[in-house]
Amino acid sequence: MNKHSEVITTAITNYDIHDIARASTTYDVERYFIIHNVPSQRELAETVMSHWKTGFGSTYNPDRKDAFKHVELVNSIRQAIDMVTELEGQTPIVCTTDARTYDNTITYASLRKSLESESRPVVVLFGTGYGMTKETMEDFDYILEPIYGHGDYNHLSVRSAVSIILDRLRGEAWWNK
């Protein structure tokens, strides 16, 4: 969506691909899906991914190659969920993110507990622009509570949000020390 709540398609950025791949690898995420159905955007993602997986970047920066091992490009949310179901042998819990709360909002602590204690896989979806439509979001099991900073401003880049959320869900439990 855009700021007028119109359905749009946002552009993939090189930085988002890199930074989310690196954060996902740091937090031992099994699979990072880039979901896009526009051919020109898919081509951009494929170019970036192949540069780091098999191209010059794979030998120039082997750490970056490692970060791209678990990156997959798919056409739709449904395709990503189907791939996880096939790989894991069961349907995942699907949780999305938003800067607003909903009836099915879940806390970080609750989702972290599910990740640690349940065998069922979890898919966490992130949107770009002004997020996904309300209708799309209502199709999922949960919506993670918003990230609240110290002030009133609440519009993070997707790569910032991914890093913060991965740390809350998969990072060291420093508060237990």
Model-derived features: where do they sit?
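RNA substrate-binding interface of SAM-dependent RNA methyltransferases
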Residues: 1-99, 163-176
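Conserved acidic residues
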Residues: 30, 92, 121-122, 141
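Secondary-structure boundary/capping motif
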Residues: 41-44, 103-104, 132, 153-154
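Short, glycine/charged-enriched secondary-structure capping and boundary segments
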Residues: 47-49, 108-112, 138-141, 159
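Short, well-ordered coil/turn elements that cap or connect secondary structure elements
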Residues: 68, 89, 117-119, 137-138
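Short, exposed beta-strand "edge-strand" segments with a Pro/Gly-rich flavor and a Y/T-containing core
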Residues: 69-75, 100-106, 151-156
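Long, charge-patterned amphipathic alpha-helical coiled-coil/hairpin "stalk" segments used as oligomerization
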Residues: 95-136, 146
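Structured adenosyl-cofactor binding patch, chiefly the S-adenosyl-L-methionine
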Residues: 130-177
